[in-house]
């Protein structure tokens, strides 16, 4: 299959979505008004990115500056709504997504040692997929409990290649929805997922390295993903 290139398939805006889950009054009509929101659509952005890859079309080139003062397309915009739909598919509203969501819950409650061992198995699965030319979605685990409210710290990225660095360490090249592609930059897009250099950090043995920042993770797994063809108004957004 053709290579996945961030300049073609990484979105040009960050994962700064706010999802309006529910709003209303408690008690109804006469009570105080409440709003429940969640932050981010990393899974939707990762899934949508791969959808465009499988379609052999670049993602829409809309960028942060197009939506000022916001930094992302608003609700009602074709691309925003498609990403939201794919966010739900990634964890909730498809049987593959349910499996992903359940694995996030289960793995979040594992001991550091058990989670690390399972993540090593997932490293091998990821390498095998990439050797076949198949980019994949990786679920990054940071939560330390199986509570639903704890799951917001977990994350989803696209793994599109791997390499061995000068120290012999395996590194995955990823598209991180939190790190948008900047078409105006002369620097190559580079975000790396690898085992942490500090061997004593048993609690957080993986690190995601992006420009100016390193995030630490408990482990990761290869997610279930199935391509979907976006509607024409999404492709042309």
What are these regions (language model features)?
Residues 1, 8-28, 189-195, 228-236:
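N-terminal low-complexity, intrinsically disordered segments
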Residues 6-119:
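Cysteine-nucleophile protease catalytic domains, especially the papain-like/related folds used
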Residues 16, 45, 141, 175-177:
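Structured loops at beta-to-helix junctions and adjacent beta-edge loops in soluble globular domains
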């Amino acid at each position: 299959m053709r290579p996945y290139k961030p300049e073609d398939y990484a979105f040009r805006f960050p994962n700064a979505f706010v999802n309006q889950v529910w709003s209303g009054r408690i008690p109804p009509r006469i009570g105080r008004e409440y709003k429940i929101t969640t932050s981010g659509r990393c899974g939707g952005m990762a899934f949508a990115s791969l959808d465009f890859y499988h379609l052999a079309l670049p993602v829409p080139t809309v960028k942060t500056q197009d939506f000022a003062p916001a930094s992302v397309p608003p609700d009602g915009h074709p691309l925003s709504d498609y990403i939201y739909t794919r966010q739900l598919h990634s964890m909730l509203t498809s049987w593959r997504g349910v499996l992903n969501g359940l694995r996030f819950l289960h793995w979040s409650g594992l001991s550091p040692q058990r989670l690390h061992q399972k993540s090593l198995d997932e490293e091998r699965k990821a390498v095998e997929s990439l050797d076949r030319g198949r980019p994949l979605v990786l679920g990054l685990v940071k939560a330390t409990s199986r509570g639903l409210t704890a799951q917001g710290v977990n994350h989803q990225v696209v793994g599109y290649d791997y390499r061995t660095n000068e120290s012999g360490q395996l590194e995955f090249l990823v598209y991180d929805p939190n790190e948008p592609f900047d078409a105006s930059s002369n620097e190559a897009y580079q975000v790396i997922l690898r085992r942490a250099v500090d061997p004593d950090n048993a609690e957080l043995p993986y690190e995601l390295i992006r420009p100016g920042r390193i995030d630490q993770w408990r482990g990761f797994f290869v997610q279930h993903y199935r391509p979907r063809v976006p509607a024409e108004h999404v492709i042309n957004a």
